[in-house]
Amino acid sequence: MEIVIEWRSLSDRKVIDPASHLSEWIENNPGCKIYIGCDSSNLGPSTTFATVIVLHKENKGGHVIYNRISESRIKSRYERLWREVELSVSAAHLLASWGFGKPDYIDIDLNPDPKYQSNTLLSSAVGMVESMGIKPRWKSKSPWAISVADSICR
């Protein structure tokens, strides 16, 4: 069974065709930066993931498209955080398949401070993202896409 993922515009929450939507926005806003990120939350029997593509126009704001998927609850924090990285990387592959090349950044919801559990995944996640030729950003490096994804998945 194939999972159908609906992409939506954050501004009006309407379902969109992501490739044509991004193409039109980028054409009207040349020079914009593209960031990708994912966040998740557990509620009841499900884990909900929100993956976002942020189009940022320097000093002019931006635009966000996103999708939300729910899976059976992932109890392991490590597995859930790693799934966030996987979904961000998948979105980067989609972006390339739509003809937009690589994003400027993939923002990952991991902390460089060893006192946080997510720290143990940071080097692996950074390696995965960098192996694709994409720059990663994490908690101390202003990961905008994660902030947006956090508000969507809740």
Feature locations, PLM:
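Acidic helix/loop or adjacent segment enriched in Glu/Asp that either coordinates divalent metal
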Residues: 71-99
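A short acidic (Asp/Glu
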Residues: 45-49, 114-121, 148-149
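Short, low-complexity, polybasic intrinsically disordered segments
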Residues: 112-142
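N-terminal targeting/trafficking signals and adjacent low-complexity tails
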Residues: 1-6, 10, 115-117, 130-132, ...
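C-terminal edge-of-domain segments
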Residues: 41, 48-50, 136-137, 141-154
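Short glycine-rich phosphate-binding loop at a beta-alpha junction
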Residues: 103-110
